[in-house]
């Protein structure tokens, strides 16, 4: 896995209320994050790994799915493509990677396995992984070995170790096709 492509395409989201993560989808010229990361804000800043800030408008939100799309000012054409996995091919035990900015710190990638590809919580299905997930990772991608986005990091159980969750990729296909 070539981590440099991930490193270049995952950004930090900041606003006066905190921070999270997002990732760039070149085919759509949009950044994807969680709704709860940008809730209450119409504009935010996205920062690359050189800490360059770019103003981004929140252009689409779906609170029920916890997805938000951001349009940032700037030329991102040189960034590598991060593709959405064509379908949900995750199985228990498959290796996944969680990329983002935990606690607002510099970029990290953690590795883990799929604990459950379809964990039902609150009437929705999520990816459950044992990869390290912390506040600030929200909105960042969950990737497979082929560097395809298989999910969007959303939360962890604070009272348990190694229980991170992500929005499944098929949930993401509809909003970005909008």
Residue ranges and their predicted role:
Residues 1-3, 56, 65, 77-81, ...:
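C-terminal cap/linker of serine protease catalytic domains
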Residues 7-8, 15-20, 26-100, 104-108, ...:
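Conserved active-site neighborhood of the chymotrypsin/trypsin-like protease fold
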Residues 109-120, 165-168:
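Short, compositionally biased
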Residues 17, 60-62, 115-118, 146, ...:
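A generic structural motif
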Residues 23, 132-153:
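Catalytic nucleophile loop of clan PA
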Residues 116-128, 176-178:
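Short peripheral tails and domain-boundary helices/loops at the edges of structured domains
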Residues 80, 127-134:
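Short pre-catalytic strand/loop immediately N-terminal to key active-site residues, enriched for Gly-Thr
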